[in-house]
Regions:
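Alpha-helical scaffold domains
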Residues: 265-335
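Aromatic (phenylalanine/tyrosine) cluster motif
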Residues: 8, 27-29
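Basic polycationic patches enriched in arginine
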Residues: 2, 11-13
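Auxiliary alpha/beta "docking" domains used to position bulky ligands
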Residues: 35-226, 265, 274
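Iron-sulfur cluster-binding cysteine motifs and their immediate structural context
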Residues: 57, 232-255, 262, 276-300
Length: 335
C-alpha cells in the first residue's frame, strides 16, 4: 500500500531520530569505555611523547611542579635589579616558581622543545660585515608563540581523548612561569652558563613550551650538566652581560638593550652593540655544544629576505608602512 505524505514524513523523522540516538549512544559508550578503563599512566606518558613528536616537537619531557629550589636564585636576581625595566618579571613574585598557582590542581608539567635554527643562517658573514644588520636568528621567521601554543593545545586535546576529565593549559612565554628550570627538570637539557638550556644533541637553538596538566604522570629525570670548565659564553659577551656563571644582568645584555629597553641605550654600550639591530646570539654561537644544533623542520621559521642580513643603509629608508609589512606576524613587532 502507498504511504501518505504525512506517514512518509513521520517515518523519516523516526528514522532520523533513531540515527541521532544511535550516534549519541555511540558517543556516550565511547566516553564510558574510556572512563571505565583503568588508566595506565606509564603507557600514557609514552604516548604523549609520541604524539608530541608527531606534532613537531623534537623533545618532550615530564616533570612535577616543585620549583622551590629555583626561588632563592630568582629572588636574588630580582633583588639585584638584573631584570632592568622588565617590571613584569617582579610583578608576580614567586608565582613563577609555582605552576599550580596558574592552574589549580596542576600535578605535572609537560615541557617541549622545537628547533628554530634556519639552514642558511649565515651567522659569521653577517656579524663580520659592518654594512649589514644582524637580527637574532629566532626572529627571522614567523612569531613562534602562536605556532607552539596551537601545537600544545592539540597535544592537550589528544590527551583529553584518553582522559576526558583532564584539565590542561598551554604556555609559550604567555604567563609567569620558569620555563628553563622546568625544562631542566624534565630532562630536555641542562642550564648553561649563559642561562639557556643546552642539549647534547641539539645545542640551544630551540624554543620551549609548557603544558600544565592535572594527571600524576611518571616524571623524567634531569640530564648531566656538560659545561664543565668552559667559560666561552662569558668571554664572548660584548657587554659583559654574563656577570657570573648562570647569571645574566639583563641591563647589559644586547638582547635586552635592543628589544626590551624602552628608553635610549646607554652610551657605554652603543659601540659594543656593533651591527646587532635586534637581539644577540653571541653566547650561543661560541658554545661548543651548538656544533650539534639541529635545523628547524618548520617552514614558518624560514628567514624572511628583508630581515636576513639587511643592508643597514637601506633600513634608514624604511617607512613605517614598509616596516609593518615586513614584520607582519613576526616577533619583531613587539618592539
Amino acid at each position: 500500500p502507498r504511504l501518505s505524505a504525512a506517514s512518509f514524513s513521520a517515518r523519516r523523522r523516526s528514522s532520523a531520530c533513531q540515527m541521532e540516538c544511535g550516534i549519541l549512544a555511540g558517543f556516550f559508550f565511547t566516553v564510558w569505555s574510556v572512563m571505565s578503563q583503568p588508566l595506565d599512566l606509564n603507557e600514557l606518558a609514552h604516548k604523549i611523547k609520541q604524539w608530541g613528536a608527531e606534532l613537531g616537537f623534537q623533545k618532550v619531557g615530564i616533570t612535577d611542579t616543585d620549583l622551590s629550589a629555583s626561588e632563592p636564585k630568582l629572588q636574588a636576581w630580582l633583588d639585584k635589579q638584573y631584570h632592568g625595566e622588565m617590571e613584569w618579571m617582579a610583578r608576580h613574585g614567586m608565582m613563577r616558581a609555582r605552576p599550580h598557582e596558574l592552574l589549580p590542581g596542576t600535578l605535572r608539567v609537560i615541557s617541549v622543545r622545537m628547533n628554530y635554527l634556519p639552514a642558511n643562517a649565515a651567522f659569521a658573514r653577517t656579524l663580520k660585515d659592518p654594512s649589514l644588520g644582524y637580527v637574532s636568528r629566532y626572529a627571522l621567521g614567523r612569531d613562534y608563540h602562536k605556532l607552539l601554543r596551537n601545537r600544545l593545545k592539540k597535544l592537550g586535546e589528544t590527551i583529553q581523548q584518553h582522559c576526558v576529565s583532564l584539565n590542561f593549559r598551554p604556555f609559550v612565554d604567555s604567563a609567569p612561569i620558569l620555563e628553563r628550570p622546568i625544562a631542566e627538570k624534565a630532562g630536555l637539557g641542562w642550564t648553561g652558563k649563559h642561562s639557556l638550556i643546552l642539549s647534547r644533541d641539539a645545542g640551544s637553538f630551540f624554543f620551549l613550551g609548557e603544558l600544565l596538566i592535572d594527571l600524576p604522570l611518571p616524571v623524567d629525570g634531569p640530564v648531566e650538566e656538560g659545561c664543565c670548565r668552559c667559560v666561552a659564553c662569558r668571554t664572548i659577551s660584548p657587554t659583559g652581560a654574563i656577570v657570573e656563571p648562570y647569571t645574566v644582568d639583563a641591563r647589559r645584555c644586547i638582547s635586552y638593550l635592543t628589544i626590551e629597553l624602552e628608553g635610549a641605550i646607554p652610551e657605554e654600550f652603543r659601540p659594543l652593540i656593533g651591527n646587532r639591530i635586534y637581539g644577540c646570539d653571541d653566547c650561543q654561537l661560541i658554545c661548543p655544544w651548538n656544533r650539534y644544533s639541529q635545523l628547524a623542520d618548520e617552514e614558518d621559521f624560514s628567514p624572511r629576505k628583508a630581515l636576513h642580513a639587511p643592508p643597514l643603509i637601506e633600513l634608514f629608508a624604511w617607512s613605517e608602512a614598509w616596516f609593518l609589512k615586513v614584520t607582519e606576524g613576526s616577533a619583531i613587532r613587539r618592539i
